[in-house]
Amino acid sequence: MPTRFSKHRKSRGDVCAGYGRVGKHRKHPGGRGNAGGLTHHRINFDKYHPGYFGKLGMRHFHLLRNQYHCPTVSLEKIWTLVPESVRKSLAAKNDGTAPVVDVTQKGFFKVLGHGILPTQPIIVKARYFSKVAEKKIKAVGGACILVA
């Protein structure tokens, strides 16, 4: 073994200082990986990984998650999702430009048709639209875009 690769050049007597001759440096004295986490490596695990071992609480075996989770937003609340600065600038221009509102980014999936929309057009992106909501948005010159 070239000495320039060893951790210390001077091997002092040279019997297995290069760790050769069948396992003289021994293999894995502390065990591999997370071995000994409850015994000889316990201090490390308790300090840096508290709660790694053991159980806590009870599992809910037959938990049924809501498969039809679909948070909704009404048309009357749609303009509150547009930033106020954008609202004012659009009202001042009045040239027909429409803001794009992605309700999925705000945590809603479906747009419902309750309420009255201003006459200003608006582009709404959502996963679902009710028929009334779609009709009202298109009536003011807006657009409904379906998002996956």
UniProtKB/Swiss-Prot annotation:
**Is this entry keyworded Methyltransferase?**
no
Q: List the Pfam families.
A: Ribosomal_L27A
Sequence segments annotated as region (Disordered): 18-38
Name the family the entry cites. Answer: Belongs to the universal ribosomal protein uL15 family.
Identify the gene encoding this protein.
rpl27a
- Can you supply one Gene Ontology CC term for this chain's record? ribosome
| Protein name (database record) | Large ribosomal subunit protein uL15
- Classify the source by domain of life: Eukaryota
Q: List the disulfide bonds.
A: none
Q: Which GO terms describe its molecular function?
A: structural constituent of ribosome
Protein's GO biological process: translation
UniProt-listed SUPFAM superfamilies: Ribosomal proteins L15p and L18e
Could you tell me which PROSITE patterns the record lists for this protein?
Answer: RIBOSOMAL_L15
| Species in which this protein is naturally found | Dictyostelium discoideum
List the keywords (alphabetical).
Ribonucleoprotein, Ribosomal protein
InterPro entries recorded: Ribosomal_uL15, Ribosomal_uL15/eL18, Ribosomal_uL15/eL18_sf, Ribosomal_uL15_CS
